[in-house]
């Protein structure tokens, strides 16, 4: 396990990031090497609507024919990425924005012809990330990747998980607008994949929290050791560098 931490910030959270979020990133930087991966779903949907293009999803993934990929690339690599980079720099954090196709950072395998230009991470060029970090920059990654010189859309959660796994990161942190998983009205601070599945089956975890914990479970399957779900509108870091929220680790199955 290394001293890298990957922070994944969904597109719906980008306009909700205030001083407290950037203060938390500064605190994390004191102990760890930080990489940020962002989404951009709401802005992509709005731009597609402006262009009279239907938003279509299949199994949670955006169906991405060529005309949609052009807009995804424009939003993720352009306005969304640069807005977050500028926000970090405004708070005196040195950041460099790049996409997964820059330097072949994220090399992908197409998911299926049916959903178009959508890929899954198969290789991460970690030397690029490490080089930026060694120059005291925070890499801010837009989740698009490359395959056979074509650009592909990547689900931001799986892009973050792929990067975290490739770096053998200490932790993957999902930034949300809730404190974490609640059980009987109390914050569930520590849990594992088996308990999460059990809580979903019992109906304890419902609604918008389900995709969040499913993303955490998928990350664990990709080799990430620890995933935390935190509230990015509050201080989510302890003095020790530990996260305040719900931390999910891999369970140990007993035969």
Swiss-Prot record:
Catalysed reaction equations from the record: N-acetyl-L-glutamate + ATP = N-acetyl-L-glutamyl 5-phosphate + ADP
GO MF annotation: an example: acetylglutamate kinase activity
GO CC annotation terms, alphabetical: cytoplasm
Site (Transition state stabilizer): residue numbering on this chain: 8, 212
Name of the top EC class for this enzyme: transferase
A biological-process GO annotation: arginine biosynthetic process via ornithine
Chief location: cytoplasm
Cellular compartments annotated: Cytoplasm
Pfam families to which the protein is assigned, alphabetical: AA_kinase
EC number: 2.7.2.8
Keyword rRNA-binding tagged: no
UniProt entry keywords in alphabetical sequence: Amino-acid biosynthesis, Arginine biosynthesis, ATP-binding, Cytoplasm, Kinase, Nucleotide-binding, Transferase
Residues reported to bind substrate: 40-41, 62, 153
Pathway: Amino-acid biosynthesis; L-arginine biosynthesis; N(2)-acetyl-L-ornithine from L-glutamate: step 2/4
PANTHER family, sorted: N-ACETYLGLUTAMATE SYNTHASE, N-ACETYLGLUTAMATE SYNTHASE, MITOCHONDRIAL
The family this protein is said to belong to: Belongs to the acetylglutamate kinase family. ArgB subfamily.
Function: Catalyzes the ATP-dependent phosphorylation of N-acetyl-L-glutamate.
Protein name, per record: Acetylglutamate kinase
UniProt source species: Bacillus cereus (strain ATCC 10987 / NRS 248)
Lineage start: Bacteria, Bacillati, Bacillota, Bacilli, Bacillales
